[in-house]
Amino acid sequence: MKKFVCLANLMLLVVFSTTSSLAVAQDEVEVETVVEGLNNPSGIAIQPETGVVFIADSGALRVVRVIDGKAEPVIVGFTRDNYGKGPIYDIGPLGLLFLDKDTLVVGGGGKPDGEEMIRVYKVPDPGAEPIKAENTEGEPKMLPATDAMVGEGNFYGLAKGAKGIYVTCNGDDQKGWVSLATLSGLKIDKFERKIATKMVTLVDAPVAITISPEGHVTVGQMGEISVAGDSLLTFYNEDGKMLDNFRTGLNDITGLAYGPKHGRLFATDFNWLDTDNGGLYKIIAIKDNYEECKAQEIVKLKKPTALAFDSDGNLYITLAGNTSEGAETPDGKLVMIKGLDFVPED
């Protein structure tokens, strides 16, 4: 018990915000629309050196970048699949991650489980013709079914650690795999199942993922979309050993991101059971409680799917939109909250 308590204290101190110093009133938060007309956008990455925002415009089967307030196609021609219970969402590309300024990793969602791919691309220059989804750098990697395991798909979240790229997968609901793509230079060498999250948390559907400032693999376990309040926040070392696991009280965590200035941890909650009351939350420690953390609401958002900070502490968030509910034209958005993790100068 003593060892667990010490570890839990460490996680609470270095990973979470504290209630007293980080209160944010909703009326102080201004959400700006950056781009409209997206179709179930499901991933964000900020291009190194340029700060340009790239989006997985998933239902439109493409990756775009934001230039002068407009979505410019970068990679097109992904295949289509769908996801959801009740509302059904078209999906293509999902998670995004830059390895350097010109090298983008894309997690797929448009193929059947076992045929889904993680792919690497050299992005064209701004204004150039978009490239086709099949024009990859190196061979795409998959996690096909074996005699003992079902095939994996829906590579929703990507996060780069010291050992490679950690990928959340939604194929085997009994295991809830986070997989690891190891790199050879700027190409994927091997892709293998790494952390069976459901086996240790007893909750399925790892979706959100990031790397903590201390190098821990940080996973948002979405849980069942038909069950309220079951999302978890779990920390692993890069060997796959669980370090700690916390109840959040959130419904369906879709994104996690640490602010670049303060190192505060933020989460998006899609809230499938009540999408009008999804939102952005800051994760806060509860003193002397080693099983739960507090999710402090920053602002309500409808159907948030992913988030990413730029180097100035501005937070970008994708909102899926209402095409699954009969909207005639795609109405997904990229929104921004300026300076959410800004450190004022003395």
Regions from the PLM with identified roles:
Residues 66-70, 122-127, 183-187, 236-241, ...:
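Short loop/turn segments that connect beta-strands within beta-propeller blades
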Residues 14-24:
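C-terminal segment of classical bacterial N-terminal signal peptides
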Residues 113-119, 174-181, 227-233, 275-281, ...:
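Structural motif
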Residues 32-35, 69-79, 128-145, 189-201, ...:
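Beta-propeller fold detector
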Residues 36-50, 80-107, 140-166, 198-224, ...:
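Beta-rich, blade/repeat-based domains predominating
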Residues 306-346:
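Blade-level signature of beta-propeller repeat domains, shared across WD40, Kelch, NHL, RCC1
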Residues 58-59, 109-111, 170-173, 214, ...:
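Short loop/turn segments immediately following the C-termini of beta-strands
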Residues 25-38:
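A short helix->beta-strand "capping" segment at the edge of beta-propeller domains
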